Structures are given as structure tokens and as C-alpha cells.
Amino acid sequence: MRSEIIRVRTGGREAVHDITAECAEFARDASGGGDGLLHVFVPHATAGVALIELGAGSDDDLLAALRDLLPADNRWEHAHGSLGHGRSHVLPAFIAPYASVPVLGGRLALGTWQSIAMVDLNVDNPDRQVRLSFLG
């Protein structure tokens, strides 16, 4: 297995950050043009990984849906940090902190409109890590 960490800077705001290019480059290099499985994992208790269409408004729609589902207010028992920080600790129950994508011939076998995104509602932690692992 080959594994490495990429760093993502969300800028201290809610974010759906596209990491597809980084994942594709890693998969190409790690696979040597062969087949296998890319596993994407966010080692944080307040972020997730989504396979979603990006750039056509879906990323904004996802953030809007999460704001409706997980409001940034004082209802949360886990109540340190910024207002609504507790919702970030609930996020991984809805958007898992991992995803696996087939790699065929060194290329990610994503659907036409699929991208790989790190989803982060935690405005208190603008610097994130994503672990990419290739099994082949």
C-alpha cells in the first residue's frame, strides 16, 4: 500500500473543497498505470469526503442543505469554539470521513459529473489533512 497526506486550506470558512486533481495525480503515480483502489480519508472529527458534482451549484446547494440540517446556533451540547461548532462534530454521521474510488489503468473511475470533495463546516480549523492511500 502506498499512502500520503495532502494539505487543504479552507480559509476558516465553510467549504466544499475539490481535491479531485490531487487524488487523480496520486492514483496515477501510485498505481503505475495499473488497477486498484484509492481510499480517501479525512483524519478529523469535523469533516467529511463526498463524491459530488462540483462547479454547477451543487457545492453551494450541499452547504445550504447542511446549514438547514445542522444550523450554526447554540442548540449543540458540544459547545466550544465558534457558535454552532457542535454541528461540525455531527457532520461525519451524514458525510463520512472517507470514500473509496476504483482506479482502472491508472485513472480514477469516477462518473462523468463526479468529483471528490472534502466537506468542512468547522470555521475554527482552516488547515486540514487528507490521507490518500492506494491499494493495488
Kindly give the residue locations of the regions a language model identified.
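Active-site histidine-anchored catalytic micro-motif
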Residues: 1-136
